[in-house]
A protein has these predicted regions:
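Short phosphate-binding loop-to-helix
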Residues: 67-101, 109-110
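Conserved core of the sugar-phosphate nucleotidyltransferase
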Residues: 110-217, 228-232
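Short, conserved phosphate/pyrophosphate- and ester-handling motifs at nucleotide-, phospho-/glycolipid
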Residues: 239
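Short internal beta-strands
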Residues: 39, 54-59
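Short, acidic, metal-binding catalytic loop of nucleotide-sugar glycosyltransferases
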Residues: 44-51
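N-terminal nucleotide-binding beta1-loop-alpha1 segment
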Residues: 1-23
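Short catalytic helix/loop segments, enriched in acidic residues and glycine
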Residues: 22-40
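Short, charged/polar "capping" segments at the starts of alpha-helices
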Residues: 61-66
Length: 254
């Protein structure tokens, strides 16, 4: 089974200060390793035997296309106002080829082995979410600053990898859309699971897998996390410190 890769290369509303520090107004076009960062995950996806084609979504698809070498497996489309609405549009499009692997233009360290491990871990799920465990990442990169979600048994950061196996995932995306504009959307989603889930999360009574299982039962879906062995899967380029770190990794200095 081969996936259709969805690469999100959009921009935040308003001025992107990070991008402007590097001479552009789009984060996907910031140079990493001497080339626009979006090229790196695109090249990795096209080289993966797990991927049949790649759809790149952006508010300015022509600008993204202008920096990507042509390939018949590539398709460029305009994204909607939000990520959730963009994904709902894909769910409702009869031309969408399932399953989908969703990642982002700032995943500059994505490699074929990460994709392969994630896809194997996502088998038989309806939704799978790639994560990296805190201890593994900090062992590799002790000074890396990431956002950590803490649960009983461990803390995790996201790996910007999501597997959506069929249109059955639509209720989960609708739930995401309902909280997408909330700055504390993670807590809002947990609140929607009910007081037991909220209290359990606050007190760290649940593991990550247990909380995702609760969400899955609420939605009638099989949802789980795939903990990736390569800590670099948890590193994206979202701020100047990330850019410095990734450049150091690519140059073999970190």
């Amino acid at each position: 089974m081969k996936y259709t890769a969805i690469l999100l290369a959009g921009s935040r509303p308003g001025r992107d200060e990070f991008a402007h520090q590097f001479g552009t107004d789009m984060k996907a076009l910031v140079a990493v390793g001497g080339e626009p960062m979006v090229r790196r995950p695109v090249r990795t996806l096209l080289a993966s035997p797990r991927i049949a084609k790649v759809i790149i979504l952006s508010q300015a698809p022509d600008r993204i296309a202008s920096v990507i070498p042509s390939d018949p497996r590539l398709c460029f489309r305009s994204s909607s106002a939000t990520i959730a609405q963009t994904m709902l549009d894909l769910c409702d499009d009869p031309e969408t080829s399932w399953p989908l692997l969703v990642t982002t233009a700032d995943h500059a360290l994505l490699d074929a082995a990460i994709i392969d491990e994630f896809v194997r871990g996502a088998a038989r799920a309806d939704i799978a979410i790639g994560v990296v465990e805190q201890g593994e990442l900090l062992h590799r990169l002790p000074h890396s600053q990431r956002t950590w979600l803490k649960f009983r048994g461990g803390a995790y950061t996201g790996a910007n990898l999501f597997a959506l196996l069929s249109p059955r995932v639509r209720p989960a995306i609708e739930l995401w859309r309902s909280v997408e504009q909330d700055r504390k959307k993670g807590w809002r989603m947990i609140y929607l699971l009910g007081p037991v889930a909220l209290a359990g999360t606050l007190l760290k009574l649940f593991t990550l897998d247990e909380l995702l299982a609760r969400l899955g039962r609420k939605l009638g879906l099989r949802i789980w996390a795939v903990t990736l062995s390569n800590p670099l899967a948890g590193v994206d380029v979202d701020k100047p410190a990330d850019h410095t770190l990734v450049e150091s990794i690519l140059q073999g200095r970190a």
